[in-house]
Amino acid sequence: GLGLRYVQGIGSFATFDEFLHLTYGGARWSSSTRVLYSTSDNDFRFRNYNSKEFVTDDDGQIVGEYYPLQRNRNGGFRDLHVMQELYYTTRGGDRFSLAAWYLDSHRGLAMLTSDRNKSKQKQNTQDERTLRAVAGWERLRNGLKLGARAGYTYTDLRYLLKQDPEGKGQFVVNTDARSRIHTLFAKAEAEYALGEKWLFSANAALHQHRVRSGDLSVIGNNGLRADTLYRQERFELSAFAAVKWRPVPRLGVAADLRWELYGDRTTPVIPALFADYVLSKRGSVVVRASAARNYRYPTLNDLYFRPGGNKNLKPERGWTFDAGLETTLKGDARSLRASATAFDSRIDDWILWIGSPKLGIDTPINIRRVHSYGVEAKLSAEAETSGGWRLLLDGNFAWTRSINRGDPFSPADESVGKQLVYIPVYSAALTARVEWRRWELTYKWNWYSERYTMSSNDLGVLGRVKPYFMSDLSLEKGLDCKWASFSLKGCIHNLLNEEYESVLSRPMPRLNV
């Protein structure tokens, strides 16, 4: 039958969201159409701690100082998403699918708090148009599952920087970076279950990339537009095989092998091994462990992006190990699940984009070795009372160390032995939800410790993003009538009105709805 769902959202800072979902389901055919349209001025107020103002008396003597309240500048956006899916199932059980997704986005890139320009003097925008179309086929018979997909993706990305120092509306283009990316792809996969103890799977995928990217605003010595485009194509092929074996109900073992070809180069065979064992059926206590080789080759942007690409980059390679414990407790109308995992990863030639003082731009480099290790813990609980109340809780905590173990690039390089930039050492999140009849109350909380913004881990004014926590609260009520179902939902973001930045010099909104 036919289905219709429409959601209208209205929020702070002239934010409007509209979502429409149309569905149809028949004996053989089914269809799904989704449309999402979002707009916002995104001009929230914040206190600018990078711009100190001084108060003077009639004699010009400084008698006070303060940090001014300002509005977020050039941060508005408009996004349109359209997705169409069509499915057909034959009498023999084959399932064919067609899907297309389109994105049309226009976003202003908000000015940094340290930027002294006005909106009339500087405009930063990014426009993106992306089309992705995929055709697929699936079949499941006698324990054998087969599938194939093929498609095409096109992206047109434009970054535009315009400036008018006098603020008279006569903008001059400083940067007009354009990227057009074409990708053809195909994938075939198979999965076969041999009894209850064995499961075999394999897939092969290929991609053909074609990229044209550069700055169209550059003028050469002859007064004509310079050709800064990089034109690159690359063929990529990957093959993957896996086997899972459960010799006894308590023990499970799995092994993976992966191999890839990119351009005229190939990766080594990349193995991975997984195991899990039920220590105790009482409490469902399970211990898990894995070991995997890592290998990541540079992307076309890493190699050739202008300006900044590095054609001499080496691929990342290394090993990752992890081990953990999980338990699940269930009772009448309640359950509890907890897990803890420790991991250790050592990567050679880690690819990292950094600012180059010599070139004045960001460029990717290889760090000889990065050692990443830590612990992750998760907890979820659920309970239901005789009065119809339902309580749900999900939480997680992580301790992560990502240390540069490479060699210094110069005598002044203080990054060796330090935490990588923008990776918090501690982080945590919690979601609590209460449901009763058609009411739902949800509280979300997350926290991040300080993050370094300089590879030396200097704690100066511009050397870190301060720790912060966030609280969101929402209340939803469902309503039913003979011909439709409705819901009303109210949300409060940043409930405790926290002042914070997620990226240096880019403040985030305080309390808003």
Residue ranges and their predicted role:
Residues 1-24, 33-35, 70-75:
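Short strand-turn segments of transmembrane beta-barrel domains in outer membranes
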Residues 34-36, 40-42, 143-161, 278-280, ...:
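Membrane-embedded beta-barrel scaffold of Gram-negative outer-membrane proteins
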Residues 40-46, 447-456, 475-513:
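C-terminal beta-signal and adjacent terminal beta-strands/loops
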Residues 73-79, 93-146, 152-182:
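Flexible loop and strand-edge segments within Gram-negative outer membrane beta-barrel domains
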Residues 126-128, 152, 168-254, 421, ...:
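Outer-membrane beta-barrel transmembrane domain signature of Gram-negative proteins
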Residues 197-201, 205-209, 224-345, 431-433:
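Structural signature of Gram-negative outer-membrane beta-barrels, strongest in the C-terminal barrel
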Residues 246-251, 338, 342-346, 366-454:
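Gram-negative outer-membrane beta-barrel transporters
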